[in-house]
A protein has these predicted regions:
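Positively charged
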Residues: 1-136
Length: 136
């Protein structure tokens, strides 16, 4: 189901709780909402649709990928980026890394470890920040 975009900075600044198998329906809501905003959005976190759970979705070279409980375990190649967000007006500068290694659970709640680089890595960092209550 397409959900409205949360814009309340107090809600968005809260840390999200770990996701469980009971939160699988949130992943579908994220898919539907990301698809509805595909012209101006490449990733979302569950708190952006009002669910304070550690779930993100992002465009991974044309395919939507969902991660439950993502954590960056390694990063390298710091740089300054300028980013926008559906939940906040305008753009802001922030520190990002060119390469990240992420541990997460897939939609079967199997633990995975994968390295991402470039723009995809930047998207993932932005969405994991949302899960941690960090707003750009």
């Amino acid at each position: 189901m397409i959900k409205p975009i949360m814009k309340d900075p107090i809600f968005l600044a809260q840390k999200s709780a770990p996701a469980t198998v009971m939160d699988l329906p949130i992943a579908q809501d994220l898919r539907d909402t990301l698809e509805a905003h595909r012209d101006g959005c490449v990733g979302m976190a569950a708190n952006m649709i009002g669910a304070a759970k550690r779930i993100i979705i992002f465009d991974d070279n044309g395919s939507a990928t969902v991660m439950f409980n993502p954590e960056i375990v390694k990063c390298s190649g710091a740089y300054e980026a300028e980013e926008g967000c559906l939940s906040l007006p305008g753009t802001r500068k922030t520190k990002r890394y060119r390469s990240i290694k992420v541990q997460y659970q897939n939609e079967k709640f199997e633990t995975r470890l994968k390295t991402y680089t470039g723009f995809t890595a930047q998207i993932i960092q932005h969405e994991i920040d949302h899960c941690s209550g960090v707003l750009i």
